[in-house]
Amino acid sequence: MITAETNVFESLESNVRGYCRNWPTVFTTAKGAWLQDEDGKDYLDFFAGAGALNYGHNNPVLKQPLIDYIASDGITHGLDMSTAAKRKLLETLRDTVFAPRGLDYKVQFPGPTGANAVEAALKLARKVTGRETVLSFTNAFHGMTLGALSVTGNAAKRAGAGVPLVHAAHMPYDGYFDNTTADFQWMERVLDDTSSGFDRPAAVIVETVQGEGGINVARVEWLQHLAQLCAEREILLIVDDVQMGCGRTGPFFSFEVAGITPDIVTLSKSIGGYGLPLALVLFKPELDQWAPGEHNGTFRGNNPAFVTAQVALETFWSDGALEAATKAKGEKVATELATVAGHFPGLSTRGRGLVHGIAFEDPSQAGKVCQVAFERGLLVETSGSSDEVVKLLPPLTITDDELDQGLQILTGAIDTVCTGWGRLHHRAPAEGGERR
């Protein structure tokens, strides 16, 4: 609804805006798992900045060091100059993330976004191998710039490019054929047949869980087979951990569950800790064949984000507490969603860690559930090729009570949409998510 308070968005901001159309209010403050709008209404956040706020809004553990850094006139814009904040981040990344996992990676700062990281990864893979094609998968999403779009599956997003998207080919993701065709049968055949007309690719890029694609979860054995396939054919393996990294699936890296070591990893979103723009590309040392300045970006040295990223790593990843808590909360979400899905035909669930989805055979129901949930004080969005999946991405730091409250609103919204009345036992408040 357009009001005097929202008219400026309608009159001045581009039609490309999206989220505000689904959540038609003006937000003012946020803390932890909550946002508040101008009317003082509270909303539980099961969206978390599309995965950029794994540690919640304005986490005090991160906020105070950021305030102190700014107050001390610390470097803000540093390009790729050496700064004290960058040094501390690199040291903490090495000691807290790499060393305990036995990883040997070089670190590149490509720019502030996940798409920047993907573009750099694709560019590096092609440079190192001398090959052009990159393989990706059905329903993949890797960003909105041209290179990232070329390895993205969604037709609507690809259409926005306005030019042919070349030097990429798409393969079936795990479960694409509903387990009626052996995994990798097509991929292996065309790669190994010299008459297939299919040139050996530079790399394969994959999400271990496809977030925008509909919460499609790759099985451990599928990921292991993919890693082996790439290694045997000297194809670089890129894992896009922009949304699923930084603990979203439980471990820091989403690929840890499969025991594989990608050649290249892209990180963004929650790597900055506080929601500040930051992206990293990690790669094996022998792949570091960049010439100085061969790839750059004006805002690759966002030092305030270095500060909050370092504190987040030190605070949340020095032990296994967050990983264990995420897995426990994820099990609760899975159980609750399975219960509500069992009450209605045409519903199915999927997920890992604290990324979960509930899919509807009637895609229109997913959007209606999100609308009802918003009216009752919960932010959730849809994903999938037809927006048929309600996607849950709560902050990893959400409390058990907040998680229960959000699930109560969500399951009540599902009940309302699927039956037209509140048949289930869950209380579904008509107005706002009252903080408990």
Curated annotation (Swiss-Prot):
PTM sites of type N6-(pyridoxal phosphate)lysine: K269
Keywords tagged on the record: Aminotransferase, Pyridoxal phosphate, Transferase
Gene3D superfamilies xrefs: Aspartate Aminotransferase, domain 1, Type I PLP-dependent aspartate aminotransferase-like (Major domain)
Top-level lineage group: Bacteria
Its EC number(s): 2.6.1.76
GO process annotations (BP): ectoine biosynthetic process
Pfam family, one: Aminotran_3
PROSITE patterns, per database record: AA_TRANSFER_CLASS_3 (PS00600)
CC cofactor: pyridoxal 5'-phosphate
Name the UniProt record assigns to this protein: Diaminobutyrate--2-oxoglutarate transaminase
Gene: ectB
